[in-house]
Amino acid sequence: MANLKALKVRIGSVKNTRQITKAMKMVAAAKLRKATEQAESARPYSKRMSRMMHSLAPAAAGRDNAPELLVGRGDVKKVNLVVYTADRGLCGSFNSVVIRATRARIAELEKQGFQVMLTFIGRKAYDVLKRSHGHLVRKVYTEMSRHMSFAYVEKNIVKELIKDFHEGQFDACYLVFNQFKSAMSQELTWAQSIPQPIDTEGASTQTGYQFEPVEEELLEELLPRNLAVQVFQALAESEASEHGSRMTAMDNAVRNAGDMVKKLQTKYNRSRQAAITTELIEIISGAESLKG
C-alpha cells in the first residue's frame, strides 16, 4: 500500500508539472507572435538601410577623412563581442548554443593575440561566462524584453558602444545572436558592426548619383543610425528565437509529462490489482484454514 501511495503522489506531481508547462507554452506562444511580428517588420528597414550604406560607403572609404565607424583606426588589437542571450532558462539549447560559440571565439581571438571584452545583452551568458571570463566583462544589459524599442536601444546601448569605440576601449565589435527562422529553427549568427563592413561591389550601385551633402557628411549621420538598426535587429531576432525555443521546449515537456503519467498510471493500476489479488488470496487462505 505504501508503494501505491507513493505512485499516486508521483502521478499528481507530474500532472501538476504538466499543467505548469502547458501554461508556460501558452504564454511563450503569445509572446512569440508579438516578437515574430517585431522581428519581421524590422527586416525591411534594416535591408533598406543596408542598401543605402552600400551606395555611400565604398567611395567614402577610400578618402582620408572617412569616418572611423566605417573604416576603423587601422590595426585591430581590442575586440568587443556583444553576446545576446535570454534572462531566463527553460528555452532548450537557445542559450547554450550562443555560450559555446562565444567561449570558442574568445579562445580563438586570444590565441591570435587579440584583447577581448564582452558586452552581454541578456543575463544567461553573463551568469555562465563570468566564472571563467569575468575580467573581460564590459557591460551587462538585462530585462530587455521590457525595453523592446528602437529608441531605447539607440539611446542606452548604441550610444555607449560608439562612445567607448571613439575612446579607444575597443577597435572592432561583433554581434553574436540567434537569428529567427521558425519556432523550431534558429541560426547562430555572427555579424560585424564596428567598423561597419563595406561591400566593395556596392560601389557600382552609386554610379550616376550625386550626394548632397557629400558622402562623408551623410555617413556621419547614417553610420550611428545603421549601427542602431543592426543592434536592434539582432535583439528582435534573438527575442523571437528565445520565445520560439521556449514554446518548443515546453511543448516537448508537456508531451513527456503526458507519457510519464500514462506509464505511472499503468504501473499504479497493475500494483493495485496485484495488491487486491494478494488480499483475496490471504482471505481465501484464512477461510480455508478455519474450515480445517
Curated annotation (Swiss-Prot):
How the protein sits in the membrane?
A: Peripheral membrane protein
A GO term from the CC aspect = plasma membrane
**UniProt keyword Iron present:** no
Q: Which GO terms describe its biological process?
A: proton motive force-driven plasma membrane ATP synthesis
InterPro entries noted in UniProt: ATP_synth_F1_ATPase_gsu (IPR035968), ATP_synth_F1_gsu (IPR000131), ATP_synth_F1_gsu_CS (IPR023632)
Tell me the compartments it is located in. Answer: Cell inner membrane
Molecular function terms from GO: ATP binding; proton-transporting ATP synthase activity, rotational mechanism
- Supply the CDD domains for this chain: F1-ATPase_gamma
Q: Which UniProt keywords apply?
A: ATP synthesis, Cell inner membrane, Cell membrane, CF(1), Hydrogen ion transport, Ion transport, Membrane, Transport
Q: Which HAMAP family match?
A: ATP_synth_gamma_bact
Quaternary structure note:
F-type ATPases have 2 components, CF(1) - the catalytic core - and CF(0) - the membrane proton channel. CF(1) has five subunits: alpha(3), beta(3), gamma(1), delta(1), epsilon(1). CF(0) has three main subunits: a, b and c.
Per the entry, what this protein does is:
Produces ATP from ADP in the presence of a proton gradient across the membrane. The gamma chain is believed to be important in regulating ATPase activity and the flow of protons through the CF(0) complex.
The family note in this entry says: Belongs to the ATPase gamma chain family.
Q: Which NCBIfam families does the record cross-reference, listed alphabetically?
A: ATPsyn_F1gamma (TIGR01146), PRK05621.1-4 (NF004146)
Can you say what this protein is called?
ATP synthase gamma chain
